[in-house]
Amino acid sequence: AGVSAQQLRPGYVTPPSSSMLHKYVNDWVPGQELTTNYGDNGESSAWEDEEFFVSRVALKPHFVNLNTQIDKTKSDTDNKRLLFWVPINESTGVNGEWLNALPNAVFDSEVFSTWSYVTHYGNWTSPFGWVPGAMADAAHKNGVLVSGLASIPNAYLSSNWANCLAGMSAMNSDEGVKKLGNFLRYHGVDGLGYNSEYFGGGSYGEGLRGMHGKLVKYMKQYQPAFENVWYGGTNDAGSVNFNDQLSSDFYQTFGYSDEPRTILFLNYNWNSTYKLSQDASGITATGRDPRDLYMGMNMQGGLKTATEWAQHLTLPYSIGLWGAHSVNYIWINRAVNGSSDASKQATYQRDLEYWFTNGKRNPLHVMSPVNSLTATSEFMGMSRYMEARSTLSWELGTEPFVSFFNVGNGAFYNWKGEQLHVGPWYNLGVQDYMPNWRYWIATEYLGTTPAEGVDAKITWDDAYMGGSCLRITADNSGTAYLHLFKTEFEAKNNTKLTIRYKVLKGNADMSLVWSKLGSESTEAQGNYGKVFDKDGKTYSSTKPDGDVDYDADWQSKTITMTSRNKLAGTISAIGLKFENAEGLDILIGEISLTNGSYTTPTAPTVTRAKVLANNYKGIDGKVYYKMANTKEVGEPVYNLDVKTSLFRLWSRTDVDPTPKFLGTTTSWAGMIFSAPATGASKVQFGVSAVSLDYANESDIAWSEEMSTGDYVAVEDVKVSKNPVTTNEDFYVEFVDPAHAPVDWQIKDESGNVVASASSATRIDIADGLANTGSYDVVTGSGENAVERKGVISVSDPG
């Protein structure tokens, strides 16, 4: 039997069961790995993949500075929150494998990146009480809570879910809540999410509600926020009541000011005078923050929207976005501008900016609410309702600020400008900090008038680190400011601000700009910020001393901040200034702030490794490792605790001992894809830890030697031409050059065999196909037959 192309496949990583959270919590012993998994009916099996569901990045707090907001009158208590309650990526792959946000060798994977307009990402297809570590790492660095989902069907409780809720209710004690809370803390989960539209459970509903209140209180001792998410279907009595309002039959579930229990996501028909009056009464009665009430918006459509979007402008409540069950409605529409991976990814990032910033991709544009739930150039965006949030405030001596504008996927992997790996990859956990406002472009620094002629976007054409970078085009004879990061970093003597860039064409006067806390609207860089001028001269200090390299090499400028040059101080925002721009096309590969040197991490300790597949692309496998640390047993251990930004993954074989770089991860378990192994019988997987400033790394820690395993043919096929026109010759062949000869059939849409071949590795259609339409390809025979739908598309020549 064969397999599909080299990527995440069934059995590579096994997720936990959604309805068995109570069993995992009861089994968990702090400091010991969970080694038992459960099916939905409670049957147990061996498990080795817990580490893929552990976050290694602590939840960072947001900070508030009204002076670096677009609307400087909007206080934090007026700033709406946003619950993005949707799936991420495809929920399952073509072979039934569980995908979600697990690392993969697929470029066209979802790299959500507009975190500054989201406060809680409820991963709709992640198990109850669990989230993939890679997703949690990306969310946590941006201050965004994450949760999985109790995906309870819309019906009476099934036995597995009844047992689960009863088990969770039984944790309503100080000891029970402590163990549950420590379990969630260790794994990096920031709340429990419920698709609560079920009948029943009244007998243990009181215990479940009490547990929620105690859990919130317990968790807030350790992190800035924690939220249990409840869908406004099942009420306090265990009945389904979609009344779209905070009525008294939800008060106990919602909780009171002295014991908040959940945030409440209201069903979609909430916009009536009576229902809104009930909401106001409910907030008064419970004493809760009105932002803990989320007015649901169904991204699938089918409901009125223009009046709801307008109503959101007047209400004190937060916004909840849902849609849909297996894939979200921003991700699903990414192929409208082309089918290539790069095109789909570019469209997806643009649509994120349409949805969360606005249709003009600049929050300075105040756009009117529209009758739409679709990302378009007319959409008013979530920035109409809230200010972009930021976590960029910590001690630079402990942790540097570094962004390479790597979103977490690509068709290659560059390391410090050198392409070390060619091939598709995806790991959301290694995503860098993205520009907070996406994109605040103004005629003045922190100004309110939009500047024209300047555009910014993510590109996958090049990268300094990873698979992407920021691309800026500018054609503006005036002045334009692109504001990148809202910060509160103290620049001390000898703090260094670095920009790394590559000029593709054109010219401009370009400067790094920033301001200081207390004088936010005043540029602080003086002449030190100049990077290059319109005459093609570069500046390492305040005077031109070099030339712009138009031969596609990365260049850099580092500014040392001192009290003597009056640059030291608390930096409140960082951006770029463009003057006299003519056809400028530039890539930004790094913006960083460092304060001194950072410790080189110790090498990881590999605990085990496993070969998963061997085919024409190489070896797939996984490797698990630990980092020495001084944390108490059972306490979360973050990468910052072990002085590590991320881990590099490697392989080597018995015939080629040179380490081969395969990718990076923030997790303490790594997926290995396509490790080179030509002619090898033994393989090792390795991992090294990279310092916080990316300047140094540990030695590579290696697994024991493993057999490369039996070679398994890949069943994917490719068509020599696409599309094919009628009566045009073409052929179909295996992508795997080592595939054994098999029988072939081409079938039309009615199932008729229109061409065949025997014992071959390809089928030639010398005279083409006479009729337009879609054709299937079948290889093999009997129980070994593999049928692929719609592989061939035939159209008229015109």
Could you tell me what each predicted segment is?
Residues F673-E697, L769-N784:
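Beta-strand-rich modules
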Residues G618-D641, F730-P737:
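Conserved aromatic anchor
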Residues L470, Y481-V513, K557-S563, I591:
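Extra-cytoplasmic beta-strand recognition segments
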Residues S4-W115, Q221:
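N-terminal module-boundary/linker segments of secreted carbohydrate-active enzymes
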Residues K74-S277:
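Chitinase-like catalytic core of GlcNAc-active glycosidases
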Residues G453-Y481:
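Short carbohydrate-recognition loop motifs
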Residues I499, D553-I591:
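Extracellular beta-strand ligand-recognition surfaces/modules
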Residues D693-Y711, N784-D796:
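Extracellular fibronectin type III
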